[in-house]
Every structure is written in C-alpha cells, then in structure tokens.
Amino acid sequence: MFRRILIPFLLLASLVGAAAPAQAKDQHSLRILLTNDDGYSSSSTQSLRQALIAAGHQVTIVAPLTDASAVGTGLNIKFGSTLEAVERSPGIWSIAGSPGDAVAFGVRVLFASNPPDLVISGPNAGENVAALINHSGTVGAAVTALAGGVPAVAFSTARGPSNSFPSTQQSIDFAVKVVNKLAATSAYNGKILPDHTALNVNYPVTPNGQVKFAKLGTSLPVSTDYAPAPDVCATCYRILPLPATGPDPVTDADRTLLDAGNVTITALDGSWEAGPAVTTLVKVRLTNLTP
C-alpha cells in the first residue's frame, strides 16, 4: 500500500528560512533526501539510492511523479492550491510537481523535525554545465535546498552518441565517493558544506581519470531553434536543438573540461547577482535616475 498526502502550498512556501541541517548520529552516515527531475521511478536514481544505502547512508527519495526536466528552479506558489504526495513504497515518495516542489515538501514535511544532512539531485541523464544550469531542474532542486538552509549536490551524466549514457554506472559510483568524502571530512561547524553552498558535479562520457574543479561557463551547450510545422497546424513551430558552435569564453569552464573527459565539480551559491565590477559600471551609466 502507498500513502497519499495532500498538502496546501502555503506550507511549502515556508521553506525559505528553514532550520539548519542536523547531523546524523553517526558522523559518517548521512540522512539524505534524494531527488531528480526525471521522475521518482528513474532507474539511475533508484540505483544511486541503493548504492548510498549500501554505503551506510539513510536515503529517502522525494521526486516528481513524472519527468520534469528543464523547469529550472520552478516552485508552485499558488497559495491555497494542493499538491499530491504519494509514498509509493517505504522511503520512496512521488510528488505531483517540480523538483523544487519535491525538495520543499521533503524538507518541510517528511524531515520537518530534523532536516536532512544533505539533498542530492540526480544523477541526471545529460550534462548540466555553463548557462544550461539556469534551466536545469536537477540543479534547480539543489538551489531550492539552499533556500532552506540544507546543503546540496547535483549530479549529472554526460550524453553520449545516439542519446546514450555509457558512463551512468561510473557516475553513480563516483557520486557515492563524493558523498562519503563529504561525510568523512565535515569541517563547517559540523555541516557537510559551507552555508548557502551546493556542488554541481558532471561526469563525462569517456572519463580520462581526472577530476577538475571548474568555473561555471557562460555558453549554452545546446539551445533551441524553431521551424514551421504546417503538418501540425498553420501557426505551429517545431522545437529543434541548436548545438553550440564555439568554445566557452570562460577559462577552465565546466563545459570545456567536461568535453575533454574530466569529471567537473563547481561550487554554486544560488545567486544570479553580477560581480562588483559590472554593478559599478551599470550604476555609473544609470546615475541620476529618479522614479
């Protein structure tokens, strides 16, 4: 049997400002909320859960009911509406919403009395690098966790030829290594990561044996193009992929290093604020404006 819960979204909105995460009793055994944007039944997420449990961690899946890719940091704030949450089997929950909704529900309801030590999102089927993370539900779920004071790691596996993912199992094994390393080296007042910090980890198609700490690129590995689709309707357009044609302009960008076969790790803080130099330049140009 599974359990259904209908939760008003007013409760989920209180995620921001949630309590800081508590440590598990065993410092090397973490209480983990595992999510994704591919749906709770994703085989790679189920495999990661089993691998983490085998490593001694406590893992609860709280993930979207169906595929919710490319929804970014979307969160349902239609206050007064409802969300359906179903416990499909012990420790595995489906949420009729976005990855962000799943994390918000998990932190505020399932872990209400004791927040998880870590939120893990993924492993996603497809890389999440450079400007692509702005649209990623996988990374969006990790950013939602930061808003509630819970550290997070997003894992993604690069796409190979013919839409294949030959390094999926390797990426799962590496994810467990990362989690175990974080659990064994906590140094931030007992927290897994510094406040307001998430990690974005991407695993290459053909690993070269190197792990690189990368900067966040600014390019889009793939964007969208549109072509008339009169076979569907007179005003319809078909959405097509538009691959990037040039290198990322950022030195040591995650996209560049991943394409070279490196595992990439990038620290994120969830902020879209421009740096001080850009802010100063814009301020000078817009000086003396009045309402």
Q: What positions do the PLM features span?
A:
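Electrostatically charged, flexible surface regions
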Residues: 170-291
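Bacterial N-terminal signal peptides
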Residues: 8-17
